[in-house]
Amino acid sequence: VGGVDPAGIVRDVGMGVADISAGDRVALLSRVPCLSCEHCDAGNFKKCPNSVMLGVGRWGGAAELVKVPASVAVKLPRNLEFPEAAAVLRHGPMAHHLLFDIGGLKAGETVLVMGAAGGLGLTGIQIAKAAGAKVIAAAGSDERVAVGCEYGADFGVNYVKQELTEVVRTYTGGRGVDLVFENISNPKTWPKALKCLRKFGTLVTAGAHGGGKVELDCAFLYHQNIRIFGSTGSTDQNVSDTVALASEGKLKAKIEKIFPLSEIPAAHRMMEGEVLSGKIVLDPTAG
């Protein structure tokens, strides 16, 4: 059974579960720990080297019921609806981790968000803006740039039509950006994004769907004292901060369409056949 990032109401809990109760409204984190390694024994579930993705490595949430360890359940405030919660927790914790824990982004700094209309990109834009940063949204079409700006970016650039590095450096007065939030790894755009950085700037990345293998100008890297970090993780604090931002209305998901569970084939056809900027949600209560 597939289905990542479920959210719903707890039906029952096992013996020894203290923090979650039947009737609680929760969303589920996507990585399920093994519960038997040294990290899990110490309660550091997010460091589990054997974790699997819900709906990929074990049965997921495209069903009326799903059984998971209590460690992946996140309590939700009453004002956060299930579709919204499921979508924001998909990318919010990782974006928060990349921007602040790794990227060190501060209020007043400038961040370039690549793939700005995708799930991680739109999330990064909103979280950075909520922290007081200036955001440049970069995407591969005017329509997708517009989506990034709609969700809070201060400026947009179409990296297919425009020369990315030149436009960004002009916008920043020749200085460059403090942080590049990269989640594409396209061999055509990645080197240009890197050269948008100011001296002592940082590039963070968590994506490779654009190819994965890119060219690196090592002379630029060391002359400009650039830092490059990749990460797939997050912390419990990142999760809490994501829920808080969503509850306050500062982080919103772009939901393309909600399908009843009975129409899951149509949902998959939509996902496979269109270039989407929003999420597709399945609702088991709708039929």
Regions found by a protein language model. Give the residues of each.
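Glycine-rich cofactor phosphate-binding loops and adjacent beta1-alpha1 units
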Residues: 136, 146-227
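Glycine-rich beta-strand-centered segment in the early N-terminal region that forms part
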Residues: 1-41, 57-60, 77-79
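Rossmann-fold dehydrogenase core element
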Residues: 201-206, 215-255
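Mid-domain Rossmann-like dinucleotide-binding core that forms the NAD(H)/NADP(H) cofactor-binding site
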Residues: 81-162, 166
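NAD(P)H dinucleotide-binding glycine-rich loop of Rossmann-like/cofactor-binding domains
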Residues: 32-115, 150
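Hydrophobic beta-strand signal
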Residues: 27-28, 112, 204
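C-terminal hydrophobic helical "lid"/dimerization subdomain
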Residues: 191-194, 236-287
